[in-house]
């Protein structure tokens, strides 16, 4: 690059001399030797490449009319170095833009994380206080836990007076209500015409569709038909009296036809009593829900006798 610039400068200098006599020629008439020497003296320029810049130093006696002027040098500088400088500026601006964009994205992520943390903290403190009474009532978790014998909701059961024996007895025979609004949104309707059943997921739907299928498995003893062969085998144990499910606790060995009955029986050995009496002051616990319901009726009869005595 440096050699090319020197060559171009030399060529332009020779053109700038035009028809002037060489340095060894005789001086013209009418001009002194000093004036002529100043006229033909070339521009003293030093060219160098310094990290992308052109450094030049014109001679102290350079003439403004010379072809090899500051204007020419400026053009050379623009032609050789303007574009890379612009590219460097563009790159700097791009980096600044990416930096700002990254900061904005990071700020957005921090904001989202903060929002999620606030939401989780809000849920942890307890949103249930602001829920509608209908949801906190019979459709609440406390109500369902009570119906399974775990605990009584604080404040009692909505719409039921436990001091009234009739309402208490009626409540003892009730089952947990179904949240129809929730089921209508999440359940899958049975596609069979005339069937209004709704299932919670596809696995339950596939199992339910077997009901509408042909009942090819018929009991030879009583003629009852079943969709699945496993159901027929379980039913046939009623006729044979076979009890394949045996209690493995030491000293027991009691046998059952159904695995459900075995699981209920095992609670006797484990001492698990899941169903608790909800009445205040009564801490009775029971293995089966039917025993709890029967026990609740005793409270109803006691309250009735007390009212009659008054």
From Swiss-Prot:
Q: How is it modified after translation?
A: Polyubiquitinated by RNF12, leading to proteasomal degradation.
GO BP terms, alphabetized: female gonad development; male gonad development; meiotic cell cycle; regulation of transcription by RNA polymerase II
Q: Enumerate composition-biased segments (Basic residues).
A: 1-15
Name where it's found. Nucleus
- Positions of the UniProt region annotated as Disordered: 1-35
**One Pfam family cited in the UniProt record for this chain:** zf-C2H2
Write out the tissue specificity statement of the associated record.
Expressed in kidney, epidermal keratinocytes, prostate epithelial cells, bronchial and small airway lung epithelial cells (at protein level). Expressed in malignant kidney and several carcinoma cell lines (at protein level). Expressed in embryonic stem cells, kidney, epidermal keratinocytes, prostate epithelial cells, bronchial and small airway lung epithelial cells. Expressed in embryonal carcinomas, seminomas, malignant kidney and several carcinoma cell lines.
Against SMART domains, the record matches this protein to: ZnF_C2H2
Q: Which UniProt keywords apply?
A: Activator, DNA-binding, Isopeptide bond, Metal-binding, Nucleus, Repeat, Transcription, Transcription regulation, Ubl conjugation, Zinc, Zinc-finger
Where are zinc fingers of the kind C2H2-type found along the chain? Answer: 188-212, 217-239, 245-269, 275-299
The record's induction entry says: Down-regulated upon retinoic acid addition to F9 stem cells.
- UniProt cross-link Glycyl lysine isopeptide (Lys-Gly) (interchain with G-Cter in ubiquitin), position: 231, 233
Q: Where is the signal peptide?
A: none
Q: Does the keyword Transmembrane helix apply?
A: no
Spell out the molecular function terms from Gene Ontology: DNA-binding transcription factor activity; DNA-binding transcription factor activity, RNA polymerase II-specific; RNA polymerase II cis-regulatory region sequence-specific DNA binding; sequence-specific double-stranded DNA binding; zinc ion binding
Entry GO terms, CC: chromatin; cytoplasm; PcG protein complex; transcription regulator complex
Its job: Involved in the reprogramming of X-chromosome inactivation during the acquisition of pluripotency. Required for efficient elongation of TSIX, a non-coding RNA antisense to XIST. Binds DXPas34 enhancer within the TSIX promoter. Involved in ES cell self-renewal.
* Family indicated by similarity: Belongs to the krueppel C2H2-type zinc-finger protein family.
Its name, as the record gives it, is Zinc finger protein 42 homolog
Q: Which organism is it from?
A: Homo sapiens (Human)
């Amino acid at each position: 690059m440096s050699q090319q610039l020197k060559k171009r400068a030399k060529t332009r200098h020779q053109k700038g001399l035009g028809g002037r006599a060489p340095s060894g020629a005789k001086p013209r008439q009418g001009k002194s030797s000093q004036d002529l020497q100043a006229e033909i003296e070339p521009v003293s320029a030093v060219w160098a490449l310094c990290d992308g810049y052109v450094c030049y130093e014109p001679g102290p006696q350079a003439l403004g009319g010379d072809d090899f002027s500051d204007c020419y040098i400026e053009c050379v500088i623009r032609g050789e170095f303007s574009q890379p400088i612009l590219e460097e500026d563009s790159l700097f601006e791009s980096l600044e833009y990416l930096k700002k964009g990254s900061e904005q994205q990071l700020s957005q992520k921090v904001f989202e994380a903060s929002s999620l943390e606030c939401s989780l903290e809000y849920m942890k403190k307890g949103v249930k206080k602001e829920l509608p009474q209908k949801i906190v009532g019979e459709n609440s978790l406390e109500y369902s836990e009570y119906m399974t014998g775990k605990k009584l909701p604080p404040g009692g059961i909505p719409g039921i007076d436990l001091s009234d024996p009739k309402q208490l007895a009626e409540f003892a025979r009730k089952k947990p209500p179904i949240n129809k609004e929730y089921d209508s949104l999440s359940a899958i309707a049975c596609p069979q015409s005339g069937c209004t059943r709704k299932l919670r997921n596809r696995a339950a739907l596939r199992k339910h569709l077997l009901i509408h299928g042909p009942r090819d498995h018929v009991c030879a003893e009583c003629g009852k038909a079943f969709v699945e062969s496993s159901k027929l085998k379980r039913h046939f144990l009623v006729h044979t009296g076979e009890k394949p499910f045996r209690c493995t606790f030491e000293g027991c060995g009691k046998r059952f036809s159904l695995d459900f009955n075995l699981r209920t029986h095992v609670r006797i050995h484990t001492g698990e009593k899941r169903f608790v009496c909800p009445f205040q002051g009564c801490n009775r616990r029971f293995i089966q829900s039917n025993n709890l319901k029967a026990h609740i009726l005793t409270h109803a009869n006691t309250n009735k006798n007390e009212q009659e005595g008054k």
